[in-house]
């Protein structure tokens, strides 16, 4: 993650661009004197978004510098200009790179893996790639969609669910999905990460899901392979740097 340093922030006091935050100007055109601070990638994301979290992990694993553009989903920033002019689906994450606007976390990560193949986030063999994608999609396609903020908000505002019922909904589907994930891991010999001894796309998806499981007090007991892989992930600096608590827009 590439952010403007404390030393240059005072020079940006008069910056008139829209992309300001408490930590300075996060716009690729930001200038300080005669120096232009150019960013090759700009990630529009929200610290608490699982999909955004996945992409941050991938960027950190590959050692890629990027500009962090905070979009506060809970406050509805994704439904306001100027973001609506950038994102067709008004969701996060959105990666601006090489003049293109890429959406959907899984597509973004696969783009990064093709563009910057080292370290690889997918195995070299076709069966291994299929297995890693299946593990990743069991989280990104089975658990996440029915438990994301849009769904939870609808349950509360439209269906009038109380907090207890809302949390029961989240816990049920999250736990059921993690149990299925554990069974998939158990089909193969034990490994450090979800697939083998290096982190893959599956681990990029797992870590954010466990973060949210902890946040909603979902039990992770009886998931030994899953939690061992998660522990291995969180021992790596890349996963630590990408963690929501280390994001510039983090809120407790």
Residue ranges and their predicted role:
Residues 139-235:
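GST-like fold's C-terminal all-alpha helical module
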Residues 1-11:
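Extreme N-terminal basic, low-complexity initiation segments
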Residues 113, 209-210, 243:
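Active-site-flanking alpha-helical
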Residues 26, 33-166:
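GST-like domain detector, emphasizing the conserved glutathione-binding G-site
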Residues 226-252:
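Long hydrophobic alpha-helical segments typical of transmembrane helices together
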Residues 15-17, 25, 29:
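Cysteine-centered motifs
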């Amino acid at each position: 993650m590439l952010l403007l340093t404390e030393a240059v922030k005072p020079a940006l006091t008069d910056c008139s661009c829209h992309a300001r935050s408490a930590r300075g100007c996060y716009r690729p055109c930001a200038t300080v004197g005669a120096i232009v601070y150019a960013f090759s990638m700009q990630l529009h994301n929200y610290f608490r978004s699982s999909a955004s979290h996945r992409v941050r992990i991938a960027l950190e694993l590959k050692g890629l510098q990027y500009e962090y553009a905070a979009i506060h989903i809970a406050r509805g920033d994704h439904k306001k200009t100027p973001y609506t002019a950038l994102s067709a689906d008004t969701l996060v994450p959105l990666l601006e790179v090489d003049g293109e606007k890429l959406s959907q976390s899984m597509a973004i990560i696969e783009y990064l893996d093709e563009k910057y193949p080292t370290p690889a986030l997918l195995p070299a063999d076709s069966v291994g790639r299929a297995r890693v994608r299946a593990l990743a999609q069991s989280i990104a396609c089975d658990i996440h969609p029915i438990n994301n903020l849009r769904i939870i908000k609808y349950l509360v505002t439209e269906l009038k669910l109380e907090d207890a019922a809302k949390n029961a909904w989240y816990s049920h589907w999250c736990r059921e999905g993690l149990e299925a994930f554990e069974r998939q891991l158990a089909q193969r010999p034990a490994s450090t990460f979800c697939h083998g001894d290096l982190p893959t796309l599956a681990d990029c998806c797992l870590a954010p899901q466990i973060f949210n499981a902890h946040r909603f007090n979902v039990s992770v007991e009886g998931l030994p392979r899953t939690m061992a892989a998660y522990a291995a992930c969180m021992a790596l600096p890349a996963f630590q740097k990408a963690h929501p608590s280390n994001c510039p827009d983090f809120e407790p």
